[in-house]
A protein has these predicted regions:
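Juxtamembrane "helix exit" motif at the C-terminal ends of alpha-helical transmembrane segments
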Residues: 86-94, 115-138, 213-235, 241-244, ...
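Cytosolic/matrix-facing juxtamembrane and C-terminal tails of multi-pass cellular membrane proteins
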Residues: 256, 260-306
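Juxtamembrane helix-loop transition segments at the membrane interface in multi-pass membrane proteins
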Residues: 41-43, 50-56, 129-136, 157-191, ...
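Hydrophobic alpha-helical segments of integral membrane proteins
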Residues: 70-88, 130, 176-183, 199, ...
Length: 315
């Protein structure tokens, strides 16, 4: 029998199941992708109400550089972006949208690279040029203004995105993903009524990671000291992998201590930002997240199909 489940945000920590292993995911176009160490799966809701799923095994990643602190962060991020791009392409094609038909692997890869470059410029370099242009001196004052500008850009962008009806639906799928992961991690039944009892925010969320990156960058840039011109730009670009690696370790640490005082403190900023990037899902959206999780779990089994497969599930 599944253990008694209490809301994640309740003062009494709910029981975690120790042997389920880590799981993550992301929201897709009218769908959800889930990932575990040995497999990934995705599901999308079709216009006729059916759910289409896909799943595939993943190569073992429990050895080598993926286990080394600081080095594992950038590798994990690269894996996440690569798989996220693959799942996004599949979702667009599976739904038969005009956008999906127009995508190609090369085109989507180029779009991802361009988006990454734009993010580095807008979130990495541009905020540092603001205090320099204003003539602000002193490492703490300079970096405080830089971080506030960076935070403002991030929150403003998320806020503008949330005004779009389609993005609001994607944010609801984001919430469904988190709630389903919570339910799985706590041994709950994978049904909409049971899953609804869980928080739509999660400590390992990529949104939380972005905010932790900003906070870690503040500390790292203060330690670097006062620089300007080309050196300033170089430190913001070349220092990004270091900042990302440290931020990954912070998120990993907080995720393993989510019910401790230090864990709650570390998770608080990211939890607040997830209030923007997640929305309460309806039962249809939760069903899609459940389908993605079940497809992922099935792909981990030795008897599962070793190659990606697609199946329609009646609504």
């Amino acid at each position: 029998m599944a253990p008694q489940v209490t809301p994640i945000h309740d003062d009494t920590p709910p029981p975690l199941v120790d042997d389920v292993g880590p799981i993550g995911g992301q929201a897709l176009l009218e769908g959800v992708m889930m990932r575990r160490a040995g497999a990934w799966g995705a599901a999308v809701r079709q216009a006729d109400g059916s759910i289409t799923t896909t799943a595939a095994a993943l190569p073992s990643d429990g050895t080598g550089v993926r286990t080394v602190p600081l080095l594992r962060g950038p590798v994990a991020l690269w894996d996440s972006v690569s798989l996220g791009t693959r799942a996004t392409l599949w979702a667009a094609q599976a739904r038969g949208t005009s956008d999906g038909k127009g995508y190609s692997k090369v085109g989507l890869a180029l779009t991802t690279v361009l988006a990454a470059v734009l993010a580095v410029v807008v979130l990495g370099v541009a905020p540092a040029l603001v205090p320099q242009a204003l003539g602000i001196e002193g490492r703490w004052a300079f970096n405080a203004v830089e971080s506030l500008v960076r935070l403002g850009v991030l929150v403003g962008y998320m806020g503008l995105l949330s005004l779009s009806p389609q993005v609001k639906r994607t944010f609801a799928y984001h919430g469904a993903e988190h709630m389903t992961i919570h339910a799985f991690e706590h041994g709950s039944d994978l049904t909409p009524p049971a899953i609804r009892r869980f928080d739509r925010r999660h400590p390992r969320c990529g949104t939380a990671f972005l905010l932790v990156v900003i906070l870690v960058a503040l500390v790292v840039h203060v330690l670097i000291g006062e620089v300007s011109g080309a050196v300033l730009v170089a430190t913001r670009v070349l220092g990004l992998p270091v900042v990302a690696a440290l931020a990954y370790e912070v998120i990993r640490f907080a995720g393993t201590r989510r019910h401790s005082t230090i864990g709650r403190v570390l998770m608080a900023p990211g939890s607040w930002l997830q209030g923007i990037t997640t929305r309460p899902p309806d039962d249809d959206q939760i069903e899609v997240a459940i389908a993605a999780l079940r497809a992922t779990l099935a792909a981990e089994e030795p008897a599962s199909a070793p190659a990606p497969s697609t199946a329609a599930v009646a609504r």
